[in-house]
Amino acid sequence: VSGYRRDVYIPEEWKGKRLLLTIDGAAHESEVYWNGKKIGEHHCGYTAFTMDISDDAVYGIRNTLVVKVDSRESVNIPPFGFVIDYMTYGGLYREVWLDIKEKTYLKDVFVRGDLSGDTGRLISEITADGSGENLSVRQKIRRCGESGYRLLGECEMTGTKLVLDYTVESVLSWDTVHPVCYEVCTQLIRDEKVLDENVTVTGFRHAEFKADGFYLNGKKVKLRGLNRHQSYPYVGYAMPESMQRMDADILKYELGVNAVRTSHYPQSHYFIDQCD
């Protein structure tokens, strides 16, 4: 069992906002305290969790965050059950951050792209938190590295969930040799004011398995891959963004693989982003 403590200054100007505390990875059972009050717990060491501390924060002074992490095996917490064949290192091993949002904000944006020829299809599942009238969602897109966005459209949002489906002309495809990626900017708007903004990186590709193998964008591709665990010698799981990205580069450029299985749990989003 280990403990982590950090003092956090909360300025007065954050009053009336949403303060969202996210812990990206705490192995394996954790309890979170804010100014001595328990505000949450989590029972998995591989998934992120978020707590709203808006009502618990004291503004204009330093607040105290404490995280208690229990790294012992338990049959009630994945991946335990006395059958796993890998080490499950403990502790607070990924980042912790605080997002400052408006009362109504984008809670989740899930984007996926498909491809037919040079025409892309972009499907977005959008979840908002909060309430109010006159809400709309605007989406725009650009190729990564370009300066200007092109508008996809704007749609009224009457509830907390919205699905958008756009056709995007003249796109470049994503594949393992030329991994062209696009930034999708999603904005939550009320009366022409942008309340929140989310930028998601995606690509346009069509993947399918047929009887004779795997096809990417209509071309047969032989998958050469391996399993990847997130542990490192001497340090366990606790490695920064630079090492996560370098590991993906090693797999591609030194080992020559074009596929990786993230065994057996959600891994660092930095590693996943570098694979993209």
How would you label these PLM feature ranges?
Residues 1-108, 131, 261, 267-269:
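Accessory beta-strand-rich segments of carbohydrate-active enzymes
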Residues 66-68, 183-187:
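Extracellular recognition modules
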